[in-house]
């Protein structure tokens, strides 16, 4: 589906499960070769799909809850800048590591106002500056990225 451009990224990362249970993975493959034990392989494979799907569903639910909490926080704390804050927040689900130029492009703000917006979002705990520099800084939506680490 990724090759046909229906999906941009795989929904399930089954190879992680296979790495985690590498020994059983190779044993099941060998059993198919040696004894034609397709049933054992299919049961193992389906357990992998079910396990990874459960983890993906939990991650998705967590992201939805966090997204709503952050939307509420920005509406309550950002005052007149809530609109631009929410526009930026939506863009961060597609680009969680970014620069001020990205903020300018998605909000239409000047560099100074985009910089102030990001500073305020860092202060409320939604964003994190990741370079430690004064110039050419980059920021991340760390709470979102934490779901994938």
Range-by-range predicted roles:
Residues 97, 126-129:
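Short hinge/loop at the helix->beta-strand junction immediately C-terminal to the helix-turn-helix recognition helix
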């Amino acid at each position: 589906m990724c090759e046909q451009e229906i999906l941009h990224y795989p929904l399930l990362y089954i190879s992680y499960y296979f790495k985690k249970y590498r020994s059983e993975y190779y044993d099941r493959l060998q059993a198919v070769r040696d004894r034609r034990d397709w049933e054992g392989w299919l049961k193992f494979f389906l357990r992998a799909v079910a396990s990874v799907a459960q983890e993906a569903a939990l991650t998705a639910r967590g992201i939805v809850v966090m997204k709503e909490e952050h939307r509420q926080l920005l509406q309550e704390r950002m005052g007149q800048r809530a609109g631009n804050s929410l526009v930026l927040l939506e863009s961060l689900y597609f680009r969680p590591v970014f620069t001020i130029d990205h903020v300018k492009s998605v909000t239409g703000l000047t560099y100074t106002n985009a910089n102030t917006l990001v500073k305020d979002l860092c202060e409320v705990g939604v964003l994190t500056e990741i370079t430690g520099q004064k110039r050419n800084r980059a920021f991340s939506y760390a709470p979102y990225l934490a779901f994938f680490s």
